[in-house]
């Protein structure tokens, strides 16, 4: 599986995730504005953080 791993509005980058079946995208807000984190897997998140998990290559941009 290949997942995007750039932060927020950085230029898109990807990484290969051996053995993973999910990519994720987490979105939250703080004093800097909206923060977006992308990567492999499907982590558990605290309340108030939006999480999208998906199962195809580069699906988490």
Curated annotation (Swiss-Prot):
Q: Which domain of life is it from?
A: Eukaryota
Compartments where found: Secreted
Its primary localisation, in coarse terms, equals secreted
* Pfam families assigned to the protein according to its UniProt record, in alphabetical order: Toxin_cobra-type
UniProt keywords (A-Z) are: Acetylcholine receptor inhibiting toxin, Disulfide bond, Ion channel impairing toxin, Neurotoxin, Postsynaptic neurotoxin, Secreted, Toxin
Entry's InterPro entries? Answer: Snake_3FTx, Snake_toxin-like_sf, Snake_toxin_con_site, Toxin_cobra-type
Gene3D superfamilies, per database record: CD59 (2.10.60.10)
Q: Which pairs of Cys residues are joined through disulfide bonds in the record? A: 3-23, 17-40, 42-53, 54-59
Give GO MF terms, alphabetically.
Answer: acetylcholine receptor inhibitor activity; ion channel regulator activity; toxin activity
Q: Which parts pass through the membrane?
A: none
Tissue expression: Expressed by the venom gland.
According to the UniProt record, one GO cellular component term is: extracellular region
Q: Which PROSITE patterns match?
A: SNAKE_TOXIN (PS00272)
The job of this chain, per UniProt, is described as: Binds with high affinity to muscular nicotinic acetylcholine receptors (nAChRs) (tested on Torpedo marmorata AChR, Kd=0.07 nM) and with low affinity to neuronal alpha-7/CHRNA7 nAChRs (tested on chimeric receptor, Kd=3 uM) and inhibit acetylcholine from binding to the receptor, thereby impairing neuromuscular transmission. Produces peripheral paralysis by blocking neuromuscular transmission at the postsynaptic site.
The family line of this record is:
Belongs to the three-finger toxin family. Short-chain subfamily. Type I alpha-neurotoxin sub-subfamily.
Designated name of the protein: Short neurotoxin 1
Q: What species is given as this protein's source?
A: Naja pallida
What lineage, starting at the top, does this entry show? Eukaryota, Metazoa, Chordata, Craniata, Vertebrata
């Amino acid at each position: 599986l290949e997942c995007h791993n750039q932060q927020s509005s950085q230029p898109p980058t990807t990484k290969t995730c051996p053995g993973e079946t999910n990519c994720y995208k987490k979105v939250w807000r703080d004093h800097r504005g909206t923060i977006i984190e992308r990567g492999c897997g499907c982590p558990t998140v605290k309340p108030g953080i939006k999480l999208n998990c998906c199962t195809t290559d580069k699906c988490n941009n």
